A protein has these predicted regions:
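N-terminal strand-loop-strand
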Residues: 1-15
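Active-site-adjacent beta-strand/loop module that shapes the phosphate/pyrophosphate-binding cleft
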Residues: 52-78, 89
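Short, charged, intrinsically disordered terminal tails
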Residues: 117-130
């Protein structure tokens, strides 16, 4: 989990890696890029959680559609935070769900527990695993 720094909106909120898709970029490429930018991590495996979150941006009158991914990383990888965050911590899924500020991220953790709790996606591996 990452804690938002005092220099961005929602300071102090705990969240998962997230971001936006840049022009000409695929959602998968954006997920990999954001993971690297926000944590310094490289995904060993990436899963499509088969979930699409939507929310309304009232300030710009836009609807955002967000595909949700889960990354498996090397447990020995070192965290390198961007200026967007000033803290991080590893938590068990149940505890992380209590700490995350955004309800959509809590819902995604339920999918992670169900789909990847055994270390892989089981019979869905060939469908959900991106790489």
């Amino acid at each position: 989990m990452l804690r938002r720094s005092g220099t961005v909106r929602c300071p102090g909120a705990w969240e998962a890696v997230h971001g936006h898709v840049e022009a000409g970029e695929t959602p998968v490429a954006a997920a990999v890029r954001e993971l690297g930018e926000e944590t310094g991590f490289t995904a060993e495996r990436l899963y499509n959680l088969s979930r699409m979150e939507a929310f309304y941006l009232h300030r710009t009158d836009q609807v955002a559609l967000i595909p949700v991914f889960a990354a498996v990383i090397d447990p020995a990888a070192l965290v390198v935070l961007s200026g967007e965050h000033d803290g991080w911590r590893w938590l068990p899924l149940a505890k992380a769900g209590q700490e995350l500020a955004w309800p959509r991220e809590r819902r995604s953790l339920e999918d992670v527990a169900i789909l990847l709790g055994s270390g892989g996606a089981g019979p869905l591996e060939d469908v959900l695993r991106v790489f």
